[in-house]
């Protein structure tokens, strides 16, 4: 049998399969990318055992757990774990602290003829390791921050620079009032875990510096780790420039055509389009206090006309109308002010090709 492991770095770098035997509620609160939840106890069973532990102590709780998970229920769970182990012979199992639950699953699997190692310290220890990884990277790594006006193509540049970490991708949100995607954002802890693993892999690859997009503290409702936010605010800024027309077309591609495609893929043509249209209207309403009544009314009318044309004929031309007004009168003045505040941090500026070349050169792998 392979030994149990506490080598968290290798676990996350290798991306081996992990079997999470915590209760579903625990898993939903925070998990690791790709981990599979096959619990020893479901939420109701865990609740009963927890009450018993509080009232009668550990031994009584253990006995109750064996009573609740017995017979056909126990056999079905062992079968599911064994199937996972056979499908992922290089994987590991874990519970919250690497204690009784994972040990019991290991014992039951062994009795069924399957030896499978567990992670020493469990979820809690791995989570702590990832928090330390983010903290250390924020303190010790060199970082560049990519800024630019709305629609300048920052996400496109990130995709072209191997040393880049896509915060918005991990948060599943484009980082503005119109940034919500068709799928919900991941839980906060899932976001932090996935981000830390990505950071770990980039550091292991030996990049001289790491690149992130200029973000505030929040991306949608996800909170960027404070240590990283503070480091970003003090890091050199690279400014991406693009013409107004290019930016309009990029916003049209991402926030209209791309968003519509996401919703339709998720919900089907009719329901998906309705959900997409609702999402755009909600986003516009969300910034109405800052737009003012008259401008909000104008933009809402333009948006409604564009959505009607898109629904009827599949055309998106009219969307350029509200996009142009929103960029020129709302986003550009806001970003211009922010750029003035950060001017001293800008170390390079240019179009997509120039910025991409500069960033590749300044983040290249060591050696």
Curated annotation (Swiss-Prot):
Family matches, as InterPro entries: P-loop_NTPase, Rhodanese-like_dom, Rhodanese-like_dom_sf, SelU
Catalytic activity of the protein: 5-methylaminomethyl-2-thiouridine(34) in tRNA + selenophosphate + (2E)-geranyl diphosphate + H2O + H(+) = 5-methylaminomethyl-2-selenouridine(34) in tRNA + (2E)-thiogeraniol + phosphate + diphosphate; 5-methylaminomethyl-2-thiouridine(34) in tRNA + (2E)-geranyl diphosphate = 5-methylaminomethyl-S-(2E)-geranyl-thiouridine(34) in tRNA + diphosphate; 5-methylaminomethyl-S-(2E)-geranyl-thiouridine(34) in tRNA + selenophosphate + H(+) = 5-methylaminomethyl-2-(Se-phospho)selenouridine(34) in tRNA + (2E)-thiogeraniol; 5-methylaminomethyl-2-(Se-phospho)selenouridine(34) in tRNA + H2O = 5-methylaminomethyl-2-selenouridine(34) in tRNA + phosphate
Signal peptide segment: none
GO biological processes: tRNA wobble uridine modification
Keywords, sorted A to Z: Selenium, Transferase
Annotated catalytic residues: 95
Xref: PROSITE patterns: RHODANESE_3
Gene Ontology terms for molecular function: transferase activity, transferring alkyl or aryl (other than methyl) groups; tRNA 2-selenouridine synthase activity
Annotated EC: 2.9.1.3
Gene3D superfamilies: Rhodanese-like domain
Domain Rhodanese: 12-135
First-level EC class: transferase
Function: Involved in the post-transcriptional modification of the uridine at the wobble position (U34) of tRNA(Lys), tRNA(Glu) and tRNA(Gln). Catalyzes the conversion of 2-thiouridine (S2U-RNA) to 2-selenouridine (Se2U-RNA). Acts in a two-step process involving geranylation of 2-thiouridine (S2U) to S-geranyl-2-thiouridine (geS2U) and subsequent selenation of the latter derivative to 2-selenouridine (Se2U) in the tRNA chain.
NCBIfam families cross-referenced by the UniProt entry: PRK11784.1-3 (NF008751), tRNA_sel_U_synt (TIGR03167)
HAMAP family noted in UniProt: tRNA_sel_U_synth
Similarity annotation: Belongs to the SelU family.
Subunit details: Monomer.
Protein name: tRNA 2-selenouridine synthase
Native source species: Cupriavidus necator (strain ATCC 17699 / DSM 428 / KCTC 22496 / NCIMB 10442 / H16 / Stanier 337)
Organism classification: Bacteria, Pseudomonadati, Pseudomonadota, Betaproteobacteria, Burkholderiales
């Amino acid at each position: 049998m392979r030994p149990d492991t506490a080598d968290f770095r290798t676990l996350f770098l290798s991306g081996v399969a992990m079997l999470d035997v915590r209760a579903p509620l625990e898993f939903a609160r925070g998990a690791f990318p790709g981990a599979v939840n096959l619990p020893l106890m479901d939420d109701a069973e865990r609740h009963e055992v927890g009450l018993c532990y509080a009232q009668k102590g550990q031994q009584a709780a253990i006995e109750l757990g064996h009573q609740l998970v017995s017979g056909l229920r126990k056999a079905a769970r062992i079968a599911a774990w064994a199937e996972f182990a056979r499908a992922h012979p290089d994987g590991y199992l874990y519970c919250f602290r690497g204690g009784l639950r994972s040990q019991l699953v290991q014992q039951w699997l062994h009795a069924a003829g399957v030896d499978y190692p567990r992670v020493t310290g469990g979820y809690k220890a791995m989570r702590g390791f990832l928090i330390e990884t983010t903290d250390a990277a924020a303190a010790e790594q060199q970082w560049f921050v990519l800024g630019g006006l709305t629609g300048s193509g920052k996400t496109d540049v990130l995709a072209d620079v191997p040393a880049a970490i896509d915060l918005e991708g991990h948060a599943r949100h484009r980082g503005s009032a119109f940034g919500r995607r068709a799928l919900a954002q991941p839980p906060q802890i899932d976001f932090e875990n996935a981000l830390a693993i990505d950071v770990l892999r980039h550091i292991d690859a030996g990049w001289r510096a790491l690149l992130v997009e200029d973000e505030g503290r929040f991306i949608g409702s996800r909170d960027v780790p404070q240590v990283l936010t503070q480091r970003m605010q003090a890091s050199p800024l690279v400014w991406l420039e693009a013409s107004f027309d290019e930016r309009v077309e990029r916003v049209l591609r991402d926030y209209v055509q791309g968003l519509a495609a996401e919703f339709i893929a998720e919900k089907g043509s009719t329901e998906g389009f309705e959900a997409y249209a609702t999402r755009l209207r909600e986003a516009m309403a969300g910034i109405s206090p800052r737009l003012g009544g008259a401008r909000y009314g104008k933009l809402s009318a333009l948006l409604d006309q564009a959505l009607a044309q898109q629904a009827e004929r599949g055309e998106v031309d009219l969307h350029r109308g509200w996009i142009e007004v929103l960029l020129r009168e709302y986003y550009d003045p806001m970003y211009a002010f922010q750029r003035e505040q950060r001017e001293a941090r800008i170390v390079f500026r240019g179009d997509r090709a120039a910025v991409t070349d500069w960033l590749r050169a300044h983040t290249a792998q060591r050696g």
